C-alpha cells in the first residue's frame, strides 16, 4: 500500500464563466511568458534592444506549436488515422500531444524569419533564449499532469503520481511521474546553460547547442521509463534514437564552432545604433548650444568691462587737463608778480 503519492487533478479544465481554461494550454502559455521574459533580460545584457525577443517570439511560438503538433501526429498517426479514430482530433492541440523535436525545429524556422526581419544574428538570439526555452519546457511538462498522460512504469515510491483514469486502457494506480523528472531536468539544464554562458562566454550558437545536448541526455534516460505506446527501432523507442542523433549533432556543433569562431560575438541591432546615434547627436547639440551661450555671455561681459573701463579713464583724463590749466594760470600769475617787482 502506498504511503504517499502525488495526486492528479480531478479535471484538466476549469471554466471561468463561459471560457474554458485548460491546464495543458495554461502551462504552455505560462512557459512562453517565462521564456520571453528571461530571454529579453539576456538579450538586453548582450547589447540588444528591449522588445526584440518578444517580436521574434511572435513568429517562433506559432511555428513551434505547429511543428510540435505535426511531429506528434506523424509519429503517432495510429491515434488519429487508424480504424475507429476521428482524424479531426489531430487538430485538437488543447487535448495534449506536442513533440518537442518538431517544436524546436519549426520554432527555429519561425525565429529565423523574425530575426531576419529585425536584422539581428540568429545564433546570438538563440543563445539568449536557450535557458528560457528550457524553463518553458519545465513548466509545459506539467500539462501532462493535468491530462494524466505520459507517465512511467508502475511504482510505489513516495513521489509516485496517482493516475485515476487512463485513455489507453491501463489500470489506475501509481506510476513514475516522468513529467516531473523531465521538468526538474529542464530546470537543471537552464541553470547549466546560464552558468556555462557566464563562465565561458559562449557565443555563435554554442549556448543553444549546450541546451540541446543537455536536454537530449536527460530525455534519453527518461524515455526508457515511459510506458505510453511508441514506435520502436532496433529495440529503442523512436524518441531515444532522435535524442541520440540530435545530441551528437549538438556536441559536434559546439566543438567545431569553438574552433572556428571562439569567443562571443557582439550584438548590434540596427535600431539600437540609430537610437544611440540620435542620443549622441542630441547630446552634441546640447553641448554646442551651451558653449555658444557661454561665448555670447562672455562677449557681453567683455563689452560691459570695456565700457566701464572707458568710463573710468575719461574722468582721469579730464582731471589731468584741469591740473595743467591750473599750473599755467599759476605760472602766469607768478610771472606777472615778478614783472611788477622789476618795474
UniProtKB/Swiss-Prot annotation:
Annotated family: Belongs to the Lgt family.
Protein EC: 2.5.1.145
Primary role: Catalyzes the transfer of the diacylglyceryl group from phosphatidylglycerol to the sulfhydryl group of the N-terminal cysteine of a prolipoprotein, the first step in the formation of mature lipoproteins.
UniProt membrane topology term: Multi-pass membrane protein
Record keyword Transmembrane present: yes
TM regions (residue ranges): 19-39, 54-74, 93-113, 119-139, 176-196, 202-224, 238-258
Top EC group: transferase
Phylogenetic placement of the source organism: Bacteria, Bacillati, Actinomycetota, Actinomycetes, Kitasatosporales
This protein's encoding gene: lgt1
Chain spans, region Disordered: 269-343
Biased composition range(s): Basic and acidic residues: 283-293
Pfam families assigned: LGT (PF01790)
PROSITE patterns: LGT
Species assigned in the record: Streptomyces coelicolor (strain ATCC BAA-471 / A3(2) / M145)
InterPro entries: Lgt
Amino acids binding a 1,2-diacyl-sn-glycero-3-phospho-(1'-sn-glycerol): 141
Keyword Cytoplasm among record annotations: no
Protein name in the entry: Phosphatidylglycerol--prolipoprotein diacylglyceryl transferase 1
Keywords of the record: Cell membrane, Membrane, Transferase, Transmembrane, Transmembrane helix
Main location: membrane
Amino acid at each position: 500500500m502506498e504511503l504517499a503519492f502525488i495526486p492528479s487533478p480531478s479535471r484538466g479544465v476549469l471554466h471561468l464563466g463561459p471560457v474554458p481554461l485548460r491546464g495543458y494550454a495554461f502551462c504552455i502559455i505560462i512557459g512562453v511568458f517565462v521564456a520571453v521574459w528571461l530571454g529579453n533580460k539576456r538579450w538586453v545584457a548582450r547589447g540588444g534592444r528591449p522588445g526584440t525577443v518578444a517580436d521574434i517570439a511572435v513568429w517562433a511560438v506559432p511555428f513551434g506549436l505547429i511543428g510540435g503538433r505535426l511531429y506528434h501526429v506523424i509519429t503517432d498517426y495510429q491515434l488519429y488515422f487508424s480504424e475507429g479514430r476521428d482524424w479531426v482530433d489531430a487538430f485538437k492541440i488543447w487535448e495534449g500531444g506536442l513533440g518537442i523535436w518538431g517544436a524546436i525545429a519549426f520554432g527555429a524556422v519561425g525565429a529565423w524569419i523574425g530575426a531576419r526581419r529585425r536584422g539581428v544574428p540568429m545564433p546570438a538570439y538563440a543563445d539568449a533564449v536557450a535557458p528560457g526555452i528550457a524553463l518553458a519546457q519545465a513548466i509545459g511538462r506539467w500539462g501532462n499532469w493535468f491530462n494524466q498522460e505520459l507517465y512511467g512504469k508502475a511504482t510505489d515510491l513516495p513521489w509516485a503520481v496517482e493516475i485515476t483514469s487512463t485513455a489507453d486502457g491501463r489500470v489506475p494506480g501509481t506510476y513514475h511521474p516522468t513529467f516531473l523528472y523531465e521538468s526538474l531536468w529542464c530546470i537543471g539544464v537552464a541553470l547549466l546553460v546560464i552558468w556555462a554562458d557566464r563562465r565561458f562566454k559562449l557565443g555563435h550558437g554554442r549556448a543553444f547547442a549546450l541546451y540541446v545536448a543537455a536536454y537530449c541526455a536527460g530525455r534519453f534516460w527518461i524515455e526508457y521509463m515511459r510506458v505510453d505506446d511508441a514506435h520502436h527501432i532496433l529495440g529503442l523507442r523512436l524518441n531515444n534514437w532522435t535524442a541520440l542523433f540530435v545530441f551528437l549533432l549538438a556536441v559536434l556543433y559546439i566543438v567545431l564552432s569553438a574552433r572556428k569562431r571562439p569567443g562571443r560575438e557582439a550584438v548590434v541591432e540596427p535600431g539600437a545604433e540609430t537610437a544611440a546615434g540620435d542620443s549622441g547627436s542630441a547630446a552634441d547639440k546640447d553641448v554646442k548650444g551651451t558653449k555658444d551661450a557661454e561665448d555670447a555671455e562672455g562677449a557681453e561681459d567683455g563689452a560691459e568691462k570695456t565700457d566701464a573701463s572707458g568710463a573710468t579713464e575719461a574722468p582721469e583724463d579730464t582731471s589731468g587737463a584741469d591740473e595743467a590749466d591750473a599750473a599755467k594760470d599759476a605760472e602766469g600769475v607768478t610771472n606777472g608778480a615778478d614783472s611788477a617787482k622789476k618795474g
